[in-house]
Amino acid sequence: MWERLNCAAEDFYSRLLQKFNEEKKGIRKDPFLYEADVQVQLISKGQPNPLKNILNENDIVFIVEKVPLEKEETSHIEELQSEETAISDFSTGENVGPLALPVGKARQLIGLYTMAHNPNMTHLKINLPVTALPPLWVRCDSSDPEGTCWLGAELITTNNSITGIVLYVVSCKADKNYSVNLENLKNLHKKRHHLSTVTSKGFAQYELFKSSALDDTITASQTAIALDISWSPVDEILQIPPLSSTATLNIKVESGEPRGPLNHLYRELKFLLVLADGLRTGVTEWLEPLEAKSAVELVQEFLNDLNKLDGFGDSTKKDTEVETLKHDTAAVDRSVKRLFKVRSDLDFAEQLWCKMSSSVISYQDLVKCFTLIIQSLQRGDIQPWLHSGSNSLLSKLIHQSYHGTMDTVSLSGTIPVQMLLEIGLDKLKKDYISFFIGQELASLNHLEYFIAPSVDIQEQVYRVQKLHHILEILVSCMPFIKSQHELLFSLTQICIKYYKQNPLDEQHIFQLPVRPTAVKNLYQSEKPQKWRVEIYSGQKKIKTVWQLSDSSPIDHLNFHKPDFSELTLNGSLEERIFFTNMVTCSQVHFK
């Protein structure tokens, strides 16, 4: 028995060490199989961490879980479900999500991890000195009376020497009622760890915005804005955070919110990306048109109007009013929407872009439209004006037409696609510049990286895409901090700095530190979606945590909930289902 246990500890440590060394070398692999039904994955710092909902854990950790079942095996899962909780829902037969191990099995794995790191276990065949591995966390099925859903182990090191280990137990229950007392939690911690004094730290999270699906055909975006507040000490359970707290806005925004004020601009960006992909791959996936008339009809009418007017000013005004009216919607906050009206100074090329980007559905459309334009320029039917600074092929032809001579352009191959892409880039860059400078959120110097014409056209498109995401972030936050210009300015600079150094990432969470006094109206009369108290003394690893939340923080368990027909749709936190988490720990000294 002991020999088998020793071999198991040696093998488990060896497999974990191999995975850890691969991670340090930058080798990313899928979870490895430890046993037939057990897999281990290493979560790197910055990756989505399932423990963040409980311990605000965001460092590198090992996660041990059950191997997902094959689809044909899922029909047997109901026999394994406990009375109060159930392993993740298999009804769809698709991705079943993470799965938990029995609590007994989890304890065995924690025991092997502990044995392997114990310097007193000199009989183990492990190379010395033992490498201190990242914390190990095991998903549990909550099958014990305590409702254990996680077991964890984290090493204690002193001067690069392993001196002990902290063992964590996380439990979770779903209930409509809760009963807990702060003093009782403090006394529990004192008694468990033989302490005379303790410190408490509070945390509250307020969900300011979370996108929802418009209907069954349009899925919800991943946009989410939350206000996180921390403070110390804590006076009582569910204490409203004091104004002396530390507060941070956590912002994750997915571009293209269907009901947002930037929807029309995002549609133009999507068309720009279609052209860029077509130029790069030779295959163009055209968008559905927004106009009933064909692109050729719209361009011909546009040219006729210019010819009749013998000028450009009135035409610009007319198109601007039409576009503004077209994109107006009562669903959008008008105070924000007023910032995003179509510019009143659209030149010929920009108006042409607006018409063609909403109606072109084929390569033939491009060729026919540009043929009409070039013929009108050659005949002198129109002499449109342009903004200065454009290096597009169309602008060069227009400037040449002023002098009665034009280069011959062969509208074949990728040339028509590139011509439209160039004028679209010019137009969108000016749109973004107009907003950022007009709102005094950035200078041309700040924006130089995003609008520089010196890089190749594909990189220009990519940088404009980044700039659009920054704009989406600001628009999403404006309802909450619109009156706080310094906060909008700070957020703009944070985003600009990030995107100068990193690739486009709409899953990235941008963090904006704020003063509680500046956002007190957002939380003082609201119920938090998550409220947590941590009690500790001395080492912060040694702590007791109690948390209340209105959604399950455990992604591998489904809780049987009471009948929601009894609950009000907009009820307070007390009227909805609760999820209470308790984290306790014990410390083991090796030396």
Curated annotation (Swiss-Prot):
PTM-bearing positions, type Phosphoserine: S88
Function summary: Essential component of the mitotic checkpoint, which prevents cells from prematurely exiting mitosis. Required for the assembly of the dynein-dynactin and MAD1-MAD2 complexes onto kinetochores. Its function related to the spindle assembly machinery is proposed to depend on its association in the mitotic RZZ complex.
Gene3D superfamilies xref list: 1.10.287.1880, 1.20.58.730, 2.20.25.230, 6.10.140.520, 6.20.270.10
Pfam families linked to this entry: Zwilch (PF09817)
Subunit note: Component of the RZZ complex composed of KNTC1/ROD, ZW10 and ZWILCH; in the complex interacts directly with KNTC1/ROD.
Superkingdom assignment: Eukaryota
GO cellular component: cytosol; kinetochore; kinetochore microtubule; RZZ complex
Miscellaneous notes: ZWILCH gene is deleted in a patient suffering from colorectal cancer with chromosomal instability.
InterPro entries xrefs: Zwilch (IPR018630)
Primary location class: nucleus
Keyword annotations of the record: Cell cycle, Cell division, Centromere, Chromosome, Kinetochore, Mitosis, Phosphoprotein
Location relative to the cell: Chromosome, Centromere, Kinetochore
GO biological process: cell division; mitotic spindle assembly checkpoint signaling; protein localization to kinetochore; regulation of attachment of spindle microtubules to kinetochore
Family: Belongs to the ZWILCH family.
The name this protein goes by in its record: Protein zwilch homolog
